[in-house]
A protein has these predicted regions:
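Alpha-helical bundle regulatory/interaction domains
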Residues: 111-191
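N-terminal low-complexity or simple alpha-helical regulatory segments
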Residues: 2-142, 157
Length: 191
């Protein structure tokens, strides 16, 4: 049986090629807004530039087009002047920031169960990525696979995802030294 969730994608037809881009939830944009507020930046003006408001961000099920999501992030990075804003946003996210996925993680009995839960349900939090997972004798290996071209926000997104994964999985196992190695396809940042 195939299930198609049509509300999650915006299909744009250009010539004969269909470009499918996801519609994005706004719950993490609210975290960026809070980060900007804490640093004395005008988040209302930032949102207004993209025809958004604080109230819209908190409407359940509110979605924006990927292009708008991308432009919001790029503008926030520029406005904040922080190259590490992705990891800063990741640090802001507690396990319960991830809605029902976070609450389900709280009930996992093992690291393996938590990783498998994240792998299976990450799509309810972001349509941009999925996770791969394998285990060998000494380690768990989590891979992050882009489902769409997110080149312009890749560093921000990967950093925030890795930090929030580290934090959430640490809650499950009770200690915070889980990630021993992080390999990425972009240069190592100075921070």
């Amino acid at each position: 049986m195939t299930i198609v969730v049509a509300t999650l994608y915006n299909i744009q037809q250009k010539g004969k090629t269909l470009h499918i881009m996801p519609l994005m939830p706004t719950h993490y944009i609210a975290q960026i807004r809070d980060h900007m507020d804490e640093h004395g930046l005008d988040s209302q003006a930032w949102l207004a530039t993209f025809y958004l408001s604080k109230d819209l961000l908190h409407q359940p099920g509110y979605l924006i087009e990927y292009h708008q999501f991308e432009q919001l992030i790029l503008a926030a990075v520029e406005e904040c002047g922080q190259t590490n804003i992705g990891s800063s946003i990741g640090k802001r996210l507690s396990i319960t920031s991830h809605g029902t996925l976070g609450f389900a993680l709280l009930h996992c009995a093992s690291l393996r169960q938590a990783i498998e839960l994240c792998q299976r349900y990450i799509g309810i939090r972001t349509p941009l990525m999925d996770l791969t997972f394998k285990q060998d004798q000494k380690s768990f290996i989590i891979g992050i696979r882009e489902l769409f071209n997110i080149q312009n926000i890749r560093r921000f997104f990967i950093e925030s995802l890795c930090v929030t994964l580290q934090q959430s999985l640490s809650v499950v196992v009770g200690h915070n030294k889980l990630f021993k190695c992080l390999e990425s396809n972009f240069p190592q940042p100075s921070y």
